């Protein structure tokens, strides 16, 4: 095998060994055995919340172990692929060069997969393994901003669907002409919050407005908020008297009523002024339950931001307002999507807006990790 390829394989082996150590593969196997024992208990489903937690954690742990074992198998097979290619080339077989090309392609693909798994080891924050709640709000830019907010919503949902993650739309407030004023949805997947947390902030779009008769260039803004789903262990207790409940009829695009009953729910947390709405469920009770989940998540985030502000003050640095512009999507006069915090950029905004955002998410995870340890 050529020295360069040997060096590349050795580097990948070192990275994968580090990943295996950080993820504690043997500990993961022990954890799976324990969870499998719990899952086999006939009385487990007497407690629905515990049962869902156990089965979800078991599925995630099994998936992590399969992923690591598959990467190790592929890496161990790689030298064999190069040896076979060398033998074919030595025998002057026409397939020799083709075999080398296939081995090089596997080396490249394996590097991408190992680096992506390495990024997962950075998700060690207190809430990183949680599912995520995403709220998108249109900002400055009128109808273009509302359309931009809906484009962002589609981008994240497409990303989740491509990864076979569950998505639950909790609330959508449609704008009069096009797009949405705001939308809230949940991404049901382990580590969804840690993966998406760095998406929080203001996203800027520059394009020729499809709503302008003179086809002028328009700059639009939308804000993205990412929260971890609250669990019972977070102890976010909200006294009943602290919440005002208002009900109203669900509405669709253009303000058109889509329900003949007052099923939509608006919760106002009186002490803080936080407001949450939910209208996508079929019943008022379901909407109230979903809205309470979002309110609990917002209160948890408020508590975390207060704690972070105190830490920032101790470290002598400014706070981290989530309203800061983080990414620019330019469709005209050139095409580019660029993250303003870590300089990661791509020249294909169409693919990005269709959900191809893994590169930005990985760069964001690395950026957040550097920020948090600084």
UniProtKB/Swiss-Prot annotation:
GO terms for molecular function: translation release factor activity, codon specific. Pfam families: PCRF, RF-1. It comes from the Bacteria. The keyword Acetylation does not apply. The modification N5-methylglutamine is found at residue 256. It is found in: Cytoplasm. Keywords: Cytoplasm, Methylation, Protein biosynthesis. One of its GO terms (cellular component) is cytoplasm. SMART domains: PCRF. Methylated by PrmC. Methylation increases the termination efficiency of RF2. Its main location: cytoplasm. Peptide chain release factor 2 directs the termination of translation in response to the peptide chain termination codons UGA and UAA. Belongs to the prokaryotic/mitochondrial release factor family. This is Peptide chain release factor 2. The lineage of its organism: Bacteria, Bacillati, Actinomycetota, Actinomycetes, Mycobacteriales.
């Amino acid at each position: 095998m050529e020295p360069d390829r040997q060096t590349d394989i050795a580097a990948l082996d070192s990275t994968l060994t580090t990943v295996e150590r950080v993820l504690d593969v043997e500990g993961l196997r022990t954890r799976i055995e324990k969870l499998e024992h719990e899952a086999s208990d006939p009385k487990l489903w007497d407690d629905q919340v515990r049962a869902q937690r156990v089965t979800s954690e078991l599925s995630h742990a099994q998936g992590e172990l399969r992923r690591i074992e598959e990467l190790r198998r592929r890496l161990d097979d790689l030298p064999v692929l190069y040896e076979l290619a060398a033998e074919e080339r030595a025998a002057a077989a026409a397939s020799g060069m083709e075999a080398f090309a296939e081995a090089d392609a596997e080396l490249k693909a394996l590097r991408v997969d190992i680096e992506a798994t390495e990024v997962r080891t950075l998700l060690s924050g207190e809430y990183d393994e949680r599912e995520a709640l995403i709220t998108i709000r249109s900002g400055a830019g009128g109808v273009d901003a509302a359309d931009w907010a809906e484009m962002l919503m589609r981008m994240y949902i497409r990303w989740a669907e491509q990864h076979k993650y569950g998505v639950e739309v909790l609330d959508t407030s449609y704008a009069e002409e096009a797009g949405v004023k705001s939308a809230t949805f949940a991404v049901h997947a382990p580590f969804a919050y840690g993966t998406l947390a760095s998406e929080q902030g203001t996203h800027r779009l520059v394009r020729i407005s499809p709503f302008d008769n003179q086809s002028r260039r328009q700059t639009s803004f939308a804000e993205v908020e990412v929260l971890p789903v609250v669990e019972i262990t977070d102890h976010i207790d909200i006294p009943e008297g602290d919440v005002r409940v208002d009900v109203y009829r669900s509405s669709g695009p253009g303000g058109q009523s889509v329900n003949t009953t007052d099923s939509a729910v608006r919760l106002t947390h009186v002490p803080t002024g936080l407001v949450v709405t939910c209208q996508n469920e079929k019943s008022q009770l379901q909407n109230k339950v979903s809205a309470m989940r979002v309110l609990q998540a917002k209160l948890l985030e408020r508590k975390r931001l207060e704690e972070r502000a105190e830490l920032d003050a101790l470290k002598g640095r400014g706070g981290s307002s989530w309203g800061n512009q983080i990414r620019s999507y330019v469709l005209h006069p050139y095409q580019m999507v660029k993250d303003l915090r870590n300089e990661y950029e791509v020249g294909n905004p169409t693919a990005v807006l269709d959900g191809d955002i893994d590169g930005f998410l990985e760069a964001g995870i690395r950026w957040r990790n550097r920020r948090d340890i600084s």
